[in-house]
Amino acid sequence: MITLASSSPTRANLLKNAGIEFKQISCSFDESMIAKSLRPEIYVQNVVKTKKEQFLMANGKLTNLLFADSCVACGDKILGKAKDANEALAMLNLQSGNECSVYTAMIFLGEFELINVSKTTYKFDKFSEQELKSYLESGEWRGKAGAMTIENFNKKYITSQHGETSTAMGLNLKILKAFL
């Protein structure tokens, strides 16, 4: 059994659907202290490393711990979690009709520390303004990197994908299973 050090319901569902036994411990972290001027793969790796360090200071040495974090990058702009609907709209407008990448960093602390950064790139059609408005009103974007839900709102607009869907949802399951 592993311990998912994350409050993400999407990551928990990914593990459950993959048949991986786990327990979940909430792990809150303020990403704003990590510089977004870094390349996205470095940024997300720094976030997950810092999250791991803070968790271990607060909870002591546990084993079989899984830490993960994701960010969305559109062009040279890193998109974290939107603070409000206006910021979510700005992030989604960057994605509409464009190519964006989701970077997910994972650290698994078992017998050894294993680190992985994965990337999935999507090309999206233009988003419908009415559907975008409904999505924003639903609040489903809250707590999601780039306000993106690849399994719901963004899904119907995908015109191409390079990489694993699970990476875009917060865990690269193919790599994680190899870790285990």
Task: Pin down the residues of each PLM region.
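N-terminal beta1-alpha1 ligand-phosphate binding loop
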Residues: 1-20
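A short beta-strand-loop structural module common to alpha/beta enzyme folds
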Residues: 22-33
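Anionic-ligand binding patches
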Residues: 2, 38-180
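Surface-exposed, flexible loop/turn segments at secondary-structure boundaries
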Residues: 10, 30-32, 114
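Cofactor-binding loop segments of dinucleotide-utilizing enzymes, especially the Rossmann-like FAD-
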Residues: 7, 27, 111
